[in-house]
């Protein structure tokens, strides 16, 4: 049973030491972005390998072509899917993301394929989980559900990328309610 029977990757994610620095570098090198930076992101619920614990992380989100790029910076040593792969000072590829409209069904498929659920969270009316697929791709695979409000946010970020010109700011302000 192939993992990508129905969905394509929508995201590549990288663990970095400094999210803002990574956004600046990718904007200069690849004209990626602009990026939205979410400092010290908090979830409504967060489970890591069956334990209710949440690491202190900052995220950066932007586009390079049609691919969303995510940068992750962990500010503490709490056990996490990030510390599973990287110690302090280390950086690199972390996960690919699938935007799915049948979250429960896709979780069941991943379970049937024998991958281990490493992390699950709920934030901003969105469910997401990460399966440990390091034996397959050297990282994790994220399943991210697709409610309309998140699709609208992603479309706005993608449009900002389409309008981006070399030299524009790498980071754009985050609009919050």
Regions found by a protein language model. Give the residues of each.
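Glyoxalase I/VOC metalloenzyme domain signal
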Residues: 1-10, 14-36, 49-116, 132-177
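Short, charge-patterned binding micro-sites
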Residues: 42-47
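Conserved beta-strand edge residues that scaffold enzyme active sites
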Residues: 40-41, 124
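Short beta-strand
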Residues: 119-122
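Short acidic/glycine-enriched loop/turn segments that link adjacent beta-strands
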Residues: 8, 124-127
């Amino acid at each position: 049973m192939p993992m990508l029977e129905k969905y394509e990757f929508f995201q590549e994610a990288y663990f970095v030491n400094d999210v803002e620095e990574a956004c600046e570098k990718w904007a200069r090198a690849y004209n990626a972005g602009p990026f939205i930076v979410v400092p010290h992101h908090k979830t409504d619920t967060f489970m890591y390998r069956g334990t209710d614990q949440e690491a202190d992380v900052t995220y950066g989100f932007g586009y390079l072509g049609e691919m969303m790029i995510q940068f992750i910076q962990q500010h503490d040593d709490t056990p996490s899917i990030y510390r599973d792969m990287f110690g302090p000072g280390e950086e690199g590829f972390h996960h690919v993301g699938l935007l799915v409209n049948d979250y429960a069904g896709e979780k069941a498929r991943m379970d049937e394929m024998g991958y281990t659920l490493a992390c699950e969270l709920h934030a901003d009316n969105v469910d997401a989980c990460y399966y440990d697929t390091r034996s397959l791709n050297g990282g994790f695979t994220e399943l991210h559900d697709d409610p309309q409000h998140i699709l609208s946010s992603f479309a706005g970020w993608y449009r900002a990328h389409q309008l981006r010109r070399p030299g524009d700011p790498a980071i754009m302000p985050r609009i919050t309610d």
